[in-house]
């Protein structure tokens, strides 16, 4: 579960390394986000020469969580870290590469571009 002030690793090559969650989008008063949810975040660490800079406010979609997600068949999927991919307003990733595995739940959330760029879909 990702909430306000949560820090996440960035799983793409947009230039950001770490982001801090500002708000969870989707409904009024929503407190937590899970895999496939969109958040508003600020960039806390960035690499020089990247597409995004430190201090920018961006939208991101969560691709991995430590707490995991329950699937329809009753199984759970958990990852070793919390990670997100920075996206544009039209749900396309700002980077051109995705690092690490992503969850299959992104397919249901209409993030097909991220799923196709990912090296592994679990």
Curated annotation (Swiss-Prot):
The record ties this protein, via InterPro entries, to: Ribosomal_uL14, Ribosomal_uL14_bac-type, Ribosomal_uL14_CS, Ribosomal_uL14_sf
Presence of keyword rRNA-binding: yes
Q: Which Pfam families match?
A: Ribosomal_L14
List the SMART domains. Ribosomal_L14
Q: Tell me, which GO biological process terms does this entry list?
A: translation
Function text = Binds to 23S rRNA. Forms part of two intersubunit bridges in the 70S ribosome.
Question: Tell me, how does this one assemble?
Answer: Part of the 50S ribosomal subunit. Forms a cluster with proteins L3 and L19. In the 70S ribosome, L14 and L19 interact and together make contacts with the 16S rRNA in bridges B5 and B8.
What is the protein's name according to its record? Large ribosomal subunit protein uL14
The protein's organism comes out as Latilactobacillus sakei subsp. sakei (strain 23K) (Lactobacillus sakei subsp. sakei)
Protein's gene:
rplN
